């Protein structure tokens, strides 16, 4: 997996951003480019489907898909455009609703599924009290020691 993160998944890591509170997000327009969507209108349709899935799963759409306005230069003038600061879950839903014919969509599905699972495991671990955490770590160390003993 670490080799995959370093190569195939690098495009998703490169556009990931982190807020001051440590939460991660991706700009929708940058994600659209990585997912090979040339037209924003086509990607916006995918975002809308992902928002519906988000709402139907009981999540707060405004928390996972917060809309932001950006100012861009268009020749001599400037104009405001809509973008989104997508949560990891929002990105996961987007790649699940993306064009399945695109290879990068399959990579995105795998990347965001793995990252979402990792975050869920970390969140569950962090909710444990100190004694329970110690037991989990102790069990992990026991398994790794058994693997080392078998390899020796």
Name every feature range the model reports, one short phrase each:
Residues 50-62:
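Short, basic alpha-helical nucleic acid-contact segments in DNA-binding proteins
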